[in-house]
Amino acid sequence: MHDIEHIRKNPKGFEKAIKSRGVKEFTAKEILEIDHKKRSLTTKLQALNKQRNEVTEEIKRLKMNKSPCEEQVKLSKSITSEIETISLKEQTEKNKLVDILSNLPNISAQNVPIGEDESSNVEIRKYGKKRKFDFTPKFHYELGERLGLMDFEQAAKISGSRFTILKGQLAKLGRALINFMLETHVNEFAYTEVYHPALVKNEAMYNVGQLPKFSDDSYLTTDKLRLIPTSEVVLTNLVADKIIEEKELPIRFTAYSECFRKEAGSAGRDTRGMIRQHQFGKVELVSITTEDQSKDELERMTNAAEEILKKLELPYRIMLLCSGDMGFAAQKTYDIEVWLPEQNKYREISSCSNCGTFQARRMNTKYFLETDRKTKKYVHTLNGSALAIGRTIVAIMENYQNSDGSVTIPNVLQRYMSNDTVISKQ
């Protein structure tokens, strides 16, 4: 959610910032007009409430003196009726304002490049050497099916398209990755592990910016609960409607969960394999910080996600996303892209974002200043995938494949896999 005070003070700047996020037809004029109507109605309500209070006091005084007060009672009823009418009008204007602001993305941070799509993203750094194969490498789905450990056909019969069944050592690899990632984030980066529900209320989705904009991309149950598209929804809402002591910040959470997305806008993209699924596992990071901490926290969070890839010895690069390619709630985002040799390109495996106060305003989460407890500020929220399990399996299979179709298990994972060193056909 946006700060209406900021829009009032700099409507042209706000308009330009929103347009850079891809909302080309946006104008701040409508917001200011609705805001003006709402404020005028609020002023009228305040005056009427004051007048009614004065009349009420006069009625009390007259009754104490046993004087006639019929006219004052009549006036009080008239004022009350007018208050009810204007209150409804004020609420209508409030709803209009919230509806418009709720559908506008966050404003980019100052150092975010302006651009419309991924072609304007900026490479920050690379890590690792790309493996040179002495044979023609295969796609992960070819390897998985030949190993008899990855079953797309039966998954489609059971659930439809964009689902996968993993068996044997590949299922074990997924479990190993979950344990490895969580242990790394908890032990080396001081995140608190959380186990949480996979179903949430609409309010929780709204708080993080998933609703109302992306309503069609989530799965809604008959009793109006939604399957989470990411653990970010729950982890961020752990502090909803709270006022936190500044000394308690930053707060850091991590969780593994299954995630569910309709992928409504992905028709025809990545139709084979595990890159884009309706259900996928992911380890998520969420941080709640002060205004001054959030910039450094984004770098720290990105480093935590990077550390997983470094330990797995997978080549990757860090991309700073442009204004038009960032997620709805983000003000600055780093994408981590892992190298996939068969595709001969880097593919996103993690996204780490600083959302500033955007989510905090929606869920009303603030912190007391240590130096002045009368002053409260909105917290900053950050989130990052560290990492997506399915895409990490893809990266391991394609980078660690052998000429006979087997897959070498990265050294760091072998202790989680009964000291196995190779995934081979059983």
Swiss-Prot record:
Pathway: Aminoacyl-tRNA biosynthesis; selenocysteinyl-tRNA(Sec) biosynthesis; L-seryl-tRNA(Sec) from L-serine and tRNA(Sec): step 1/1. It is an enzyme of class 6 (ligase). Signal peptide: none annotated. It is found in: Cytoplasm. GO terms for molecular function: ATP binding; serine-tRNA ligase activity. ATP binds at R261, K262, E263, E348, I349, S350, S351. Its EC number is 6.1.1.11. Consists of two distinct domains, a catalytic core and a N-terminal extension that is involved in tRNA binding. This is Serine--tRNA ligase. It comes from Wolbachia pipientis subsp. Culex pipiens (strain wPip). The lineage of its organism: Bacteria, Pseudomonadati, Pseudomonadota, Alphaproteobacteria, Rickettsiales.
